[in-house]
């Protein structure tokens, strides 16, 4: 958003630097939140510890409902919770004037999508074995294998596009919406828009986390079918 002031431009004015700078800022925020929440842990959680614990319990509950197993939900908690933190703060930081959302760059959303893609395939192969895992792609009948296998491959590859472009498109659209609102009425119009953009930041985070659990569930639950 070239028409808006960005703090990163005070250091270096470059399109790629803007997103790299803000992603590093998000990474620092995530580390600080984790550090502050665990530095003085109490039996009865308060403050930031209480918020983070509630968030983690929510992630576990989401995983338990999706995977059907609390053990698996806790196993994948570090991945899903970290992705949730990164995506949320990346979405939310762009709402603050002078900052840009790292998730409005396809570079970050595609990277996150590829991490999820390769990890759930890795977990599927690890649990079921290489041949059994990819044999599932061929469908229930050998006669349908020549048709089902390429369809399944395309279906899985499309998940990369779905994960990355959904997040990128929504956040980029939010940034452009905010730009228009700030241009038309910089003092009054953005106030209700900020509430809407915050809601969208939370919603897109939830969708990305939920889909991560769904893809993991499909990969590790093959032997149960």
Curated annotation (Swiss-Prot):
GO terms for molecular function: proton-transporting ATP synthase activity, rotational mechanism. Keywords: ATP synthesis, Cell inner membrane, Cell membrane, CF(0), Hydrogen ion transport, Ion transport, Membrane, Transmembrane, Transmembrane helix, Transport. Signal peptide: none annotated. The keyword Membrane applies. The keyword Membrane applies. It is found in: Cell inner membrane. GO terms for biological process: proton motive force-driven plasma membrane ATP synthesis. The chain crosses the membrane at residues 16-36, 79-99, 105-125, 176-196, 202-222. One of its GO terms (cellular component) is proton-transporting ATP synthase complex. It is a multi-pass membrane protein. It holds the Pfam family ATP-synt_A. SUPFAM superfamilies: F1F0 ATP synthase subunit A. Its main location: membrane. PROSITE patterns: ATPASE_A. F-type ATPases have 2 components, CF(1) - the catalytic core - and CF(0) - the membrane proton channel. CF(1) has five subunits: alpha(3), beta(3), gamma(1), delta(1), epsilon(1). CF(0) has three main subunits: a(1), b(2) and c(9-12). The alpha and beta chains form an alternating ring which encloses part of the gamma chain. CF(1) is attached to CF(0) by a central stalk formed by the gamma and epsilon chains, while a peripheral stalk is formed by the delta and b chains. Key component of the proton channel; it plays a direct role in the translocation of protons across the membrane. Belongs to the ATPase A chain family. This is ATP synthase subunit a. It comes from Campylobacter curvus (strain 525.92). The gene is atpB.
């Amino acid at each position: 958003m070239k028409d808006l002031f960005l703090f990163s431009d005070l250091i270096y004015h470059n399109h790629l630097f803007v997103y790299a700078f803000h992603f590093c800022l998000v990474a620092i925020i995530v580390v600080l939140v984790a550090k502050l929440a665990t530095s003085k842990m109490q039996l009865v959680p308060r403050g930031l510890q209480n918020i983070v614990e509630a968030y983690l319990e929510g992630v576990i509950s989401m995983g338990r409902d999706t995977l059907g197993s609390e053990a698996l939900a806790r196993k994948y908690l570090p991945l899903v919770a970290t992705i949730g933190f990164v995506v949320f703060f990346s979405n939310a930081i762009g709402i603050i004037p002078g900052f840009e959302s790292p998730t409005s760059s396809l570079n970050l959303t595609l990277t996150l999508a590829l991490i999820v893609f390769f990890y759930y395939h890795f977990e599927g192969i690890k649990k079921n074995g290489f041949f059994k895992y990819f044999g599932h792609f061929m469908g229930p009948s050998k006669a349908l294998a020549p048709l089902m296998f390429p369809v399944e491959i395309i279906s899985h590859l499309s998940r990369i596009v779905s994960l990355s472009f959904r997040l990128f498109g929504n956040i980029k659209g939010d940034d452009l919406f905010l730009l228009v609102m700030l241009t038309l009425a910089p003092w009054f119009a953005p106030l209700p828009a900020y509430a809407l953009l915050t809601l969208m930041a939370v919603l897109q985070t939830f969708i990305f986390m939920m889909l991560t659990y769904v893809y993991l569930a499909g990969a590790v639950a093959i032997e149960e079918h």
